[in-house]
Amino acid sequence: MSSMGVLDPNNFLNQIGKDKFGNGHGDILIWKRKAEKYLCLSGLQYTIIHPGGLVDTDSSKQELVLDVDDVLMKMEKKSISRGDVVNLCIAALTESGNRSVSFDCIGKQRDAVEGGDSSVVSAEEAFRLFLSTGKTADYTLGPTGSE
């Protein structure tokens, strides 16, 4: 489990723990990205989930949108139900098929989904559909891409 926004070194989460001059500890998303990159290079199978902001709402009520490389940071609403993240974790355990993958996820109101599809699919189906795209995060991007 990680966070959306790991590609932006100026993300506000990187400022937590720093003083007004930028000194001190911090850079939580940069450290998360470094850990992800280390895992990817380890040769172990993995699934890395980058949820948007976690909210305490009912799960399975919104369309799950999965993509990579902070594309979803451009969305106006960048949150997801904690329960939906749990369901995606379970789906990753049961549906990954020995494949390593890293993705971002948010929940979207049904009427806001492009194409007008008002169906809400399960986390398992959303994950399977995402896997069929062949996408995964590009770990050459971001503040640690050249290290």
Show the residue positions of the predicted features.
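Oxidoreductase cofactor-interface core, primarily capturing Rossmann-like NAD(P)-dependent enzymes
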Residues: M1-E147
